[in-house]
Amino acid sequence: MPRSVNSVAKRARRKKIMKQAKGFFGRRKNVWTVAKNAVEKAMSYAYRDRKQNKRNFRSLWIQRINAGARLEGMSYSQFMGKVKANGIELNRKVLADLAMNHPEAFKAILNKVK
């Protein structure tokens, strides 16, 4: 009985990986064994950094809120404590946007919680 090989599936599998390796430098883009490892590593970095991205943005929002609050002589922690106590349901993303792009609206919130 002759050996059975599924060349169609094999080619499709390799083609998929090589397509993902487009734009890589050197042998990573055109040598199967190297490209396979490079794509696998890239996928693990992408997974890790999707989580990291959320942390980075949260810390950026906190920095922006802190900067806006300190202009009015209040620390970030004092401001956020008073925001929660007054029942203002704006999240950090929105507060940071107000502090950066709409300072007068942010100042109004600050005056409300003081």
UniProtKB/Swiss-Prot annotation:
Any one Gene Ontology cellular component term annotated for this protein: ribonucleoprotein complex
Single biological process term from Gene Ontology: translation
GO MF annotation: an example: structural constituent of ribosome
Keyword Transferase: no
Pfam families: Ribosomal_L20
Keywords: Ribonucleoprotein, Ribosomal protein, RNA-binding, rRNA-binding
InterPro entries registered for this protein in UniProt: Ribosomal_bL20, RIBOSOMAL_L20_CS, Ribosomal_protein_bL20_C
Function of the protein: Binds directly to 23S ribosomal RNA and is necessary for the in vitro assembly process of the 50S ribosomal subunit. It is not involved in the protein synthesizing functions of that subunit.
Similarity comment text for this entry: Belongs to the bacterial ribosomal protein bL20 family.
Protein name per Swiss-Prot or TrEMBL: Large ribosomal subunit protein bL20
